[in-house]
Design a protein with these regions (language model features):
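Extracellular adhesion/carbohydrate-binding repeat motifs centered on closely spaced tryptophans
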Residues: 1-187
Length: 187
């Protein structure tokens, strides 16, 4: 500071509020303060404070405070069953795929059939995890790619077996016996 003292806590400098830890290091991101949780951008400028229980909107991002604590690095399920996930800064994930789940634009984990970017996916209705490999859904067998989670349409060889999926993704498995020979309709 101008007086030569170590800057600690919220300090006004040239009309802008900054936050410094006990070692005088300027902090950025979401910081718990005596007034609630205050967001400081990468330059240290104060962006606003949230402090009410439940949902809070700040700079276009949603945060959730429960029992006085902001939810971070966790999942949260509302009373109506919607599941949300918050990152390390407390920001609700939205409109992205993260750790095997799709998050809607509204932030909830999508379940069941999902159509994104021209491909079909399926997320388990209980865990919200996007399915991979062979799955039987409503009595129909499907195959979902292990790396990008997309439902197979067309054909692919997996573990020495030819998988054929029609335009709806319904799978037929063909065992390849040897070069030029195949057994259709069974494993």
């Amino acid at each position: 500071t101008a007086s030569g003292k170590l800057a600690v806590g919220d300090v006004m400098i040239n009309g802008t509020c900054y936050h410094f830890d006990s070692n005088g290091i300027m902090k950025t991101g979401m910081i718990k303060t005596e007034n609630g949780y205050t967001l400081y951008d990468l330059d240290g400028y104060q962006q606003g404070t949230i402090n009410k229980e439940g949902w809070n909107l700040l700079n276009g991002d949603y945060y959730y405070i429960k029992d006085g604590e902001m939810l971070t690095d966790t999942d949260f399920q509302t009373s109506d069953g919607a599941r949300y996930t918050f990152d390390s800064q407390g920001i609700m994930r939205k409109n992205e795929q993260f750790e095997g789940r799709w998050y809607s634009e509204g932030g909830w984990c999508m379940v069941g059939w999902i159509f994104k970017a021209g491909s079909w996916y399926y997320a388990d209705p209980v865990t919200a995890q996007i399915c991979t490999g062979f799955q039987v859904i409503n009595g129909v067998q499907y195959y979902f790619d292990e790396s990008d989670y997309t439902m197979l349409i067309g054909d692919k060889i997996v573990d020495g077996k030819l998988i054929i999926a029609d335009e709806n993704g319904s799978v037929t498995i063909t065992t390849i016996l040897s070069e030029g020979w195949s057994c259709y309709g069974g494993e």
